[in-house]
UniProtKB/Swiss-Prot annotation:
Keyword presence, Aminoacyl-tRNA synthetase: no
Protein family per UniProt: Belongs to the UPF0319 family.
Cystines in this chain: none
InterPro entries named among the record's database cross-references: UPF0319 (IPR018635)
Segment forming the signal sequence: 1-21
Organism the protein comes from: Actinobacillus succinogenes (strain ATCC 55618 / DSM 22257 / CCUG 43843 / 130Z)
Alphabetical UniProt keywords: Signal
Protein's UniProt name: UPF0319 protein Asuc_1002
Length: 220
């Protein structure tokens, strides 16, 4: 009897723990750049736009909103600056979303006053603090963790001191003679666009590199 009671109690405990874990997903126009002070990567994200949390503590994400918008008769890619969003976790799954942007006017309005919504799957809105993440240094997107650490130490609107790293190493080394080195990644070029292409090519997996090279061939 004691064994049976212990088994039932253990099962109940495991069930409650499992139900306590929630998944955070983003709308189709949102990309997660960082989660709780760490740069988002494949090991952190279940998919491109989702990750798990298992508590109701304070959490912080950095997101970018991307949309194809109309500019007259043309269509162009709008990408927002990184936006820091701080919110409390929930035992429910959470959805973080941005409004759909279809034209230049809507994109400009969003840029001037970005609004990211945080809700549980049942529809309850979760209070959040939001702020732009200032981008500094060469290749600011690559320096994301360093910039975010500095932001979290600043006491700004959406900062969380607990996610700041006191001595965050620079992600990209000092530029010397047009070269930037980070481990085995080396880029060299006459302008930032060329250096960015080289950097992201070396960061990509082999399949992505092959798709990119095939695409380049079609552009000639």
């Amino acid at each position: 009897m004691k064994f049976r009671l212990a088994a039932v109690a253990a099962a109940a405990l495991l069930a409650s723990s499992a139900s306590f874990a929630g998944m955070v997903t983003g709308s189709s126009n949102i990309d997660f750049l960082a989660v709780d002070g760490q740069k988002a990567n494949r090991s952190l994200l279940k998919e491109t736009r989702s990750f798990n949390i298992n508590d109701t503590h304070t959490h912080q994400v950095v997101v970018r909103v991307s949309e194809l918008i109309r500019e007259g008769s043309d269509r162009t890619l709008f990408e927002s600056d990184p936006i820091v969003v701080t919110f409390q976790g929930s035992t429910e799954d959470i959805r973080i979303s941005a409004p759909r942007l279809t034209n230049e006017r809507e994109a400009n309005n969003f840029k001037a006053n970005p609004k990211i919504t945080v809700k549980t799957v049942s529809g309850a809105e979760i209070a959040s603090k939001q702020d732009y993440l200032k981008q500094e240094g060469f290749l600011p997107g690559v320096n994301l963790e360093e910039n975010l650490s500095n932001y979290n130490q600043s006491g700004a609107t959406a900062s969380v001191a607990g996610f700041a790293t006191a001595s965050m190493p620079a992600t990209v080394g000092t530029v010397q003679n047009g070269k930037v080195k980070k481990g085995k990644v080396t880029v060299q070029g006459e302008n930032a666009a060329e250096q960015m292409l080289q950097y992201w090519y070396q960061q990509a997996d082999k399949e992505t590199q092959e798709r990119f090279l095939n695409w380049v061939k079609t552009q000639k």
